[in-house]
Amino acid sequence: SVSLNRTDILTDVPQMLISSRGPLALKWNYVPKMVPWFVRFVANCRKEKMMHTAKYMHQILDQSLPAFDELFQDIDLEGLVESKGILYVWTNKSIKSRELEIQIRDELGVKQQLVNPKEIHDLEPNLKPFYDGGVFYDYARHARNPRKILVKLFEKFIEKGGKFLKLNIQNVDFDGELPVLRSEAQRFIFDKLVIACGAFSKRLTDKLHENIPLDTERGYHVHFKGCDHLISRPVVYADRGFGMTPMELSLIHI
């Protein structure tokens, strides 16, 4: 629930960009297009703004596990979801940033267990002991195969009378208080509408005169096949901004 607009992020960004092993890279010819977004981001890198974002992120995330439980009631998840927690580790080089995150989560009432090197080794004995400390969230869960879970949810949605249409939506507006979607040849009226198009959502929200500062972020991952047994749960290396998750038949590095 700690947002990216931390007060210390601006001092970290230059080092992230300079380092070839850093977690951040920019496509330089895209920078001019990013300037309006970046200006708004910098303006929000203040403690009161950070805490505002963290507070409302926490309210959403705090409801996520019960919400998933409700969705999962009608589908068979055997072997697809594991309840083994999530582990964050770090070195003393980034201790100031980690202390800030711990403090914020404490203020929000997040349950967290600080762990020392011995406790980290007990949890994940195959990790090279480069770490100086960490935090463990024992109630967290992870998916072994997100695609299989989504397919099961989709099939249940169709079974319960849901409809799936693949259309090019041209516009979104309102008929009174009811949202309306318009494709090239059809018009749909709904009681409620969720716009969930990822980076392309802005094309539709702009038509509603909602100026959302949404931009794109490209992420990469690597599969290490046959290595899912090396760790028992997701492990995040906070210094470098990447994580590893044991999944079906492979270890995923993000």
Positions of predicted regions on the chain:
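Conserved beta-strand segments of alpha/beta enzyme cores
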Residues: 111-113, 163, 211
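Active-site substrate-recognition segment that forms the wall
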Residues: 5-43, 171-174, 178, 187-252
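Helical element adjacent to the flavin cofactor pocket in flavoenzyme catalytic cores
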Residues: 100-106, 130-183, 188-192
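Residue-level signal for well-ordered alpha-helical positions
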Residues: 101, 126-127, 207-208
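Extended hydrophobic/aromatic segments used for targeting, binding, or gating
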Residues: 97, 112-131, 139
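Dinucleotide-binding Rossmann-like beta1-alpha1 core, especially the glycine-rich loop
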Residues: 2-117
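Short, flexible turn/loop "capping" segments at secondary-structure junctions
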Residues: 80-81, 128-130, 245-247
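Alpha-helix N-cap/helix-start capping motif
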Residues: 117-118, 147, 198-199
